[in-house]
């Protein structure tokens, strides 16, 4: 059952007030936060004031929208006017934006109530939320393990029941991988479907904002609220936005069977056998539900990872040049001159992973290496997109595991960057191609840790992804399981 619709019905029936819902939400956050550490900032005072306004509307007999009075968690790389936005970096400690990001503005206008800003890997660079400059978030299913990253705080907040819905950003898997590890639904929309205005940039040709929720229906409702053209974002698509939640049907289409392609290259070396088994069982279940399944080859899929780790750091090195303590950044006052101020500020403010990616990007963009690395990576990106185009000429949806493994122990991969990068092996090619993809729960391993499967769609086919995911979700009970904190 949709948490949004349940809360909405309770509000309009006056079974619960918005203030009661928010008060209970913050009580739960205060109870579990010492273990989970999903939030960097809580906005209790502002949230309760907004809730009181919703209650006043209801008392006056006014109609309220579906998201009015609904608590939401926001990743701390989305600018929120008057509320600290740190990107989990010490260099932005105390930074308070003077403007609102488009997505948070749209949610405010829809009446959703932000309960706080969630933790992430610094500047969204990471796959475990261990790169935060402030705290390490725990996975609600086992707090000694990571929630995934970089949107680990948002995924953990939804899994732990601290908010029914949340926003994250996805550059190479940063919504889908934590959704998989935390046992929730996470969707990366088509590049350009959701405005990036007010999202602190990591890799501008890859970044995209998307929703987290416990159910597919809530994911669809949240996507409806944030999708749409925005003149403030030059990459924003000017397309009609469907009512995704209204299009969800209880069954797959009967007249023209849905064709699902299993990406052959994703079931091989490096994939946890329990993950492979759970996803194969989910595929078999989709067949029983009426889908036609065939194996599809995307031969350049495996080259996504090396191409990404040239393109993304290259864009990051340019985007992060602005943190110089003049325009942005906590200034190092001890510097004797301008160059020292730049150097000392960036050395003290950035964490090791951010420094690693800036250096990598600067190297690949340098005169002697641009053609050998950056240009070649862009050619590989084009070939990956061609592979997807050829696949979608044969099938409607592609399917594969979201992550090669379930949640790993905190600290297990921090000294091995390459091992950490492999966490996004299945998700990165989708960002390079600009396609939509969704992760949803499809089982648990022997240790009780969630397993997610990834559905990939053609450009602007979020409606189809949500439909397939909804039918699978209704036929299974994975989404009903909750962690015991």
Curated annotation (Swiss-Prot):
It comes from the Bacteria. Pfam families: Amidase (PF01425). The keyword Transmembrane does not apply. One of its GO terms (biological process) is translation. PROSITE patterns: AMIDASES. The keyword Cell inner membrane does not apply. Its EC number is 6.3.5.7. Keywords: ATP-binding, Ligase, Nucleotide-binding, Protein biosynthesis. GO terms for cellular component: glutamyl-tRNA(Gln) amidotransferase complex. InterPro entries: Amidase, Amidase_CS, Amidase_dom, AS_sf, GatA. Belongs to the amidase family. GatA subfamily. Heterotrimer of A, B and C subunits. Allows the formation of correctly charged Gln-tRNA(Gln) through the transamidation of misacylated Glu-tRNA(Gln) in organisms which lack glutaminyl-tRNA synthetase. The reaction takes place in the presence of glutamine and ATP through an activated gamma-phospho-Glu-tRNA(Gln). This is Glutamyl-tRNA(Gln) amidotransferase subunit A. The gene is gatA.
């Amino acid at each position: 059952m949709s948490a949004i619709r349940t809360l909405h019905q309770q509000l309009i029936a006056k079974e619960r007030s918005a203030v009661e819902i928010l008060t209970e939400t913050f009580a739960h956050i205060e109870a579990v936060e010492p273990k989970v550490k999903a939030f960097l900032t809580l906005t209790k005072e502002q949230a309760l004031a907004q809730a009181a306004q919703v209650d006043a509307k209801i008392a006056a007999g006014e109609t309220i929208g579906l998201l009015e009075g609904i608590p939401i968690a926001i990743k701390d790389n989305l600018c929120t006017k008057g509320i600290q936005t740190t990107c989990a970096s010490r260099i932005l400690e105390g930074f308070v934006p003077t403007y609102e990001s488009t997505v948070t503005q749209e949610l405010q206008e829809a009446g959703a109530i932000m309960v706080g800003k969630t933790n992430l890997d610094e500047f969204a660079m990471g796959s475990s939320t261990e790169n935060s400059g402030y705290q390490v978030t725990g996975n609600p299913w086992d707090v000694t393990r990571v929630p995934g990253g970089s949107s680990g705080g948002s995924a953990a907040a939804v899994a732990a029941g601290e908010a029914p819905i949340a926003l994250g950003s996805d550059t190479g898997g940063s919504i889908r991988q934590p959704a998989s590890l935390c046992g929730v639904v996470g969707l990366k929309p088509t590049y350009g479907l959701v405005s990036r205005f007010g999202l602190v940039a990591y890799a501008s040709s890859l970044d995209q904002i998307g929703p987290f929720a416990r159910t597919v229906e809530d994911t669809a409702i949240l996507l409806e609220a944030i999708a749409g053209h925005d003149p403030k974002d030059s990459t924003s698509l000017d397309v009609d936005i469907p009512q995704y939640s209204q299009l969800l049907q209880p069954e797959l289409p009967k007249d023209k069977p849905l064709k699902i392609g299993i990406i052959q290259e994703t079931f091989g070396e490096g994939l946890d056998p329990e993950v492979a088994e759970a996803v194969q069982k989910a595929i078999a279940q989709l067949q029983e539900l009426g889908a036609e399944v065939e194996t599809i080859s995307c031969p350049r899929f495996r080259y996504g990872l090396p191409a990404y780790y040239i393109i993304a750091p290259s864009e990051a090195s340019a985007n992060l040049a602005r943190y110089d303590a003049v325009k942005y950044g906590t200034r190092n006052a001890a510097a004797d001159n301008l160059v020292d101020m730049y150097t000392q500020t960036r050395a003290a403010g950035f964490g090791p992973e951010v420094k690693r990616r800036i250096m990598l990007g600067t190297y690949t963009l340098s005169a002697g290496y641009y053609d050998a690395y950056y240009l070649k990576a862009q050619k590989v990106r084009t070939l990956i997109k061609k592979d997807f185009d050829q696949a979608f000429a044969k099938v409607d949806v592609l399917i594969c595991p979201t992550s090669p493994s379930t949640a790993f122990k905190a600290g297990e991969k921090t000294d091995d960057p390459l091992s950490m990068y492999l966490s996004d092996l299945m998700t990165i090619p989708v960002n390079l191609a600009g396609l939509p993809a969704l992760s949803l729960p499809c089982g648990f391993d022997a240790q009780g840790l969630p397993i997610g499967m990834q559905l990939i769609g053609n450009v602007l086919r979020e409606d189809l992804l949500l439909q397939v995911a909804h039918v699978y979700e209704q036929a299974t009970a994975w989404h009903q399981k909750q962690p015991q904190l």
